[in-house]
């Protein structure tokens, strides 16, 4: 008899991206208090607060004594009570302020002293320099200007995106490939096989670059401690990078080994340029400096001129030279012809169902075609031919008619008696999923597998 795990089911996770406040709110109080020990962190957090919360922080920034809660409540008109509740909860959740008992028993509010002190330093100047001076290293013989840094950052990040869509020319480190899998953006269908894109990964590719980077860095931070990294150290460094000057070099002197390792990962993502691994200076790119712009806009999609024409005969014409966009189209269509500035593809049942098998949904394919429709297509109402959108949905429904159940397959029984005996036991336990007496095979639930296996071993020993 042979026992085989039977796999099934589609994993179509919806991509959810937390903003900075939600991420910080999920950290422990001890980690938050340590984070506020750096002025760059305090300034970055302050910058992302709602207007009302910013106003409160500025009014209390130079107060050493707590204010009565009733007095703070009077700063806001009654019609803005909802905004007041949200800002109050946010400042408390981020430990920017806390309650303190006043003489006489009244409740008061006071800013977190560590946050208050370091935000003052960030706004007024003073304190320790955020990074070491590069003057001791002398002028950089291989200095990079802003256009070359922009080009480098774009190329490095595109390598990551090309790897996700399966471009053979794109190669990334094992750490990065593992992170993409842990984030649910890619998955391996079989051991040893190269990973392929998931439904969440396809949604990820539809985001704009700042939102992609923010989501990606969130996944990185969630696994940082398992890599032996100090979360506070690398978060503070990220915030520090966002206040860097584009085109200026910075020294790596004084960095810990953990931070130097993090710098190499940022180098691979395109957030910093470092000529060699052992180079003593680095240049933050625009991606690092604008990283926080993905915080509030993490759900945004790409806004670019449309280039796709879809015909009712399922032909697709894409007027683009972008290798990434062509690779994305190839995920759900069959490539027919390729010209210098245009590709022709065919949307087929097989190509769509292959994409669906990877976890990409029909709605995502339709959304991709609609958001990249050529201006000529935009003049139509609806933008995409209904025959195309309906058929893509039908192909998805056709595949989803089957209901998948995980189980363990038992087959290759030596006799019908053995099969009937084990079948009766599985049925008695209520763990039988499927049976075929003619072929002597049965499937049991993963939970019931151990009981059935033990019963079978006992029967073999007793016979």
UniProtKB/Swiss-Prot annotation:
Q: Which GO terms describe its cellular component?
A: core TFIIH complex portion of holo TFIIH complex; nuclear speck; nucleus; transcription factor TFIID complex; transcription factor TFIIH holo complex
Signal peptide segment: none
- The name on file for this protein is General transcription factor IIH subunit 4
Sorted alphabetically, the keyword list is: DNA damage, DNA repair, Nucleus, Transcription, Transcription regulation
* Role according to the record: Component of the general transcription and DNA repair factor IIH (TFIIH) core complex, which is involved in general and transcription-coupled nucleotide excision repair (NER) of damaged DNA and, when complexed to CAK, in RNA transcription by RNA polymerase II. In NER, TFIIH acts by opening DNA around the lesion to allow the excision of the damaged oligonucleotide and its replacement by a new DNA fragment. In transcription, TFIIH has an essential role in transcription initiation.
Q: Which Pfam families match?
A: Tfb2 (PF03849), Tfb2_C (PF18307)
State any single GO MF term: RNA polymerase II general transcription initiation factor activity
Its lineage reads: Eukaryota, Metazoa, Chordata, Craniata, Vertebrata
- Family membership, please give it: Belongs to the TFB2 family.
Please list the GO biological process terms of this entry. Answer: nucleotide-excision repair; transcription by RNA polymerase II
Q: What is the annotated quaternary arrangement, including any partners?
A: Component of the 7-subunit TFIIH core complex composed of XPB/ERCC3, XPD/ERCC2, GTF2H1, GTF2H2, GTF2H3, GTF2H4 and GTF2H5, which is active in NER. The core complex associates with the 3-subunit CDK-activating kinase (CAK) module composed of CCNH/cyclin H, CDK7 and MNAT1 to form the 10-subunit holoenzyme (holo-TFIIH) active in transcription.
Q: Where in the cell is it found?
A: Nucleus
Transcription regulation: present as a keyword of the record? yes
Q: Which organism is it from?
A: Mus musculus
